Amino acid sequence: MRMLRWLILSAFSVAGAVQAQGNQDSAAASAPSASIGAPVLRTSPGLRVHRLPDEKIPAFMEADQISGDPDSEVTLTGNAQVRRVDGIIKGDRINYRRDTGDVDVQGSARMLRDGTLITGPSARLNVDTYSGEIQEPNFWIGASGGTAQARHADIFSKSQMRLSQVTYSGCPCPKPSWYIKADTVDLDFDENEGVARNGVLYFKDVPILASPYLTFPVKKERKSGFLMPTYGTTSNSGFDISLPYYFNLAPNYDLTLVPRYLSKRGAQLGGEFRYLGSGYRGVAIGTYLPDDNETGRDRWMYRTYHRQLLGNGFYTDWDIAGASDDNYFRDISELGLNTASTTYLPRRGRVGWSSTYWQTYAQVYKYQTLQDPDAPLAPPYDKVPELWLKGARYDWGGFDAEWVSTAVRFQRPLLNGRRLGPDGDRLQTYPTVSYPIVRPGWFLVPKVGVHYTQYRTDWYNRDWNRIGLSNYKRTESRTVPIMSLDAGMIFERDASLFGKAATQTLEPRLYYLRVPYRDQSALPVYDTTLADFSFDQAFQENIYTGGWDRIANANQLTAALTTRWLDANTGFERLSLSAAQRIYFQDQEVTLPAEQPRKNVRSDFLVGATAALTDTLTTDVAAQYNPYDNKWSRGMVSARWSPQRLTTVAVAYRYQRDPLPGISYQPQGQNQVSLAVQWPIHRRWYGVGRVDYSLRSEPATAAAAEQSPRVTQAIAGLEYKGDCCWVGRVVYQRYAVSAADTNTALFFQLELTGLGALGTDPISLLNRSIPGYQSVVPPTPTGTTFERYE
């Protein structure tokens, strides 16, 4: 037996070479000349891809025996193949007509193109038009990993074919757990769509879904069509089922419509529109439920976000949301998304500009406040409008200079027809200059600034004594100089930690702040509150946060000390210990309305620690201790153990001391323990869960009494990992929706690799609730046209 190899090039390859050369010449002629100045890299025309027409692509033939005329008809016998740059055809015997491109394959037909392999006992194909037919074909689709068997296949083009009496599966297992049987299946690879007519979805050989018209993707890309239905149940809405339809409108925008049925409330329609372009992006979502069965009212919500670059440093953006009523998110939360705690919906629009040294914007910022009848809230002030300007120049002859100015008109919405405070205008400007001195092992940063504020207030001739305000002056101003000095050092030494070589650091830091007293009792309070004392706040210029309607007088020194143990080989931080305290040289005289001034000469102690004692165990501790009454003001302790994949245990304890009665500028107390777990139970079974339990036993308010003690959130679930292409999940969730009410939800999901998921996806819930959660299905790499090569 002899091996012959004939190469058919003739005029086709010559024409291709002439065309390629011509393209190179024209490309070179049209290339722009390099501009004077910095050199510019240009792509060589010789590196460009030049495609020939299908009928001019040369073909290579190989077989044990070849006979015939290469200019007309050739017969290949024994290990025969016809190979082109865009595909290959193999068989026991191949008859090839060069003039028409027709190929007749007999025995062990095998065709490979773009990673998709088709086999069968015989086939007829035209290599120029890539059309033909195959008897009893088997398919391996490279881009998606899917497989199919059919009685007959008609191939219409490179991208379109029709299969008759088909069994299709996207499961890569030797014995697929799921498959679709259909009378016919039309595949369109350009449109990324498979259409099965009279199709039935089987799982474990049991039919679970039938449809006269079923679509599915043939590549791991977006396509229009119905998504898998989601379903579950909640105590507030009953049985919940939705059937989303996805519109792949264009590469840069799409639309999803979500018809949804809630057994206790009725039918709802939701939608999400996403778009992305050169210099802009955005999303718009909304839902509408007419005539809620429970309330008798129409229920709806919407949210739209957009950001766009306008050129020359200008930009605009908005974030606008709204809901039909206060209880919308408590009654109709999305499955798996605990939106019941949503309190404020933003309504903001902004236009801005930025350059190297300056930034500015003008915006209107309003809110819709969703009230909880068991714990009503005072609505925040609207900013209608706000103008903001910042200039900054760093390392300017060694100096850092900043200038920040704002001008705001504040209006507060009424609460049940009652006015809760004055309205007015506020102008602020704050220029600062600092001179950072940074050297190896130490730093020193002196800083000075002057904060000026001008108010024009509408008091509405009301008596505001109840909030500490009784001065009705229309205009008022305040000028406060602020001076600070920040200094620190870093020492290092060789050490050991648990018998392992380490580098230990010692990092002392001192921060001195001087702010003279200015009487501010006659100024309104719009957007200012007392900041939580923390390691970050200990080095700030003001104990108040927000818009600085109050600037506290200060003559104080903050001392802090941090030590770290770093792995000597990798630099990984194994252990960190920190402590800080303020020392006051004068009493506090500036306060918020109803705030009790500080009289102590020392602040609470701040202590913190983080430790990665092993590669699988991490702990964090942060606490605030009051040395005067020997009580903890705030604390948090957490630990996480992850000995292996799909195995994690996280525990946390959080404590916040209750504020004194009548104090509204401090957060409500908290005393809560949390436990979150992901753990393998037996072979393919995995358990997941979380519980948050409030330990509060002496609530300060009636609203807090509703919460004490109780489970604020509970999650329990099971995951079963079948073979390589399916996972089953069932998850139960119970969570608080208000100070007195709770909601429960139950999720069922069957995830079929290569097809999608039936039921409601709880993965986002588990990712948020269980630190270190991992999916039992590892991500699979995206297939390419190079999955197979012969």
Swiss-Prot record:
**Signal sequence region:** 1-20
**GO BP term (any one):** Gram-negative-bacterium-type cell outer membrane assembly
| Localization (cell) | Cell outer membrane
Q: One Pfam family for this entry, by name?
A: LptD
Could you give the subunit structure recorded for this chain? Component of the lipopolysaccharide transport and assembly complex. Interacts with LptE and LptA.
| InterPro entries linked to this entry | LipoPS_assembly_LptD, LptD, LptD_2, LptD_C
The keyword Endoplasmic reticulum belongs to this UniProt entry's keyword annotation: no
Q: Which UniProt keywords apply?
A: Cell outer membrane, Membrane, Signal
Provide GO CC annotations from the record: cell outer membrane; transporter complex
Q: Does the keyword Signal apply?
A: yes
Role this protein plays:
Together with LptE, is involved in the assembly of lipopolysaccharide (LPS) at the surface of the outer membrane.
The similarity comment for this entry is: Belongs to the LptD family.
The name on file for this protein is: LPS-assembly protein LptD
Its source organism is Bordetella bronchiseptica (strain ATCC BAA-588 / NCTC 13252 / RB50)
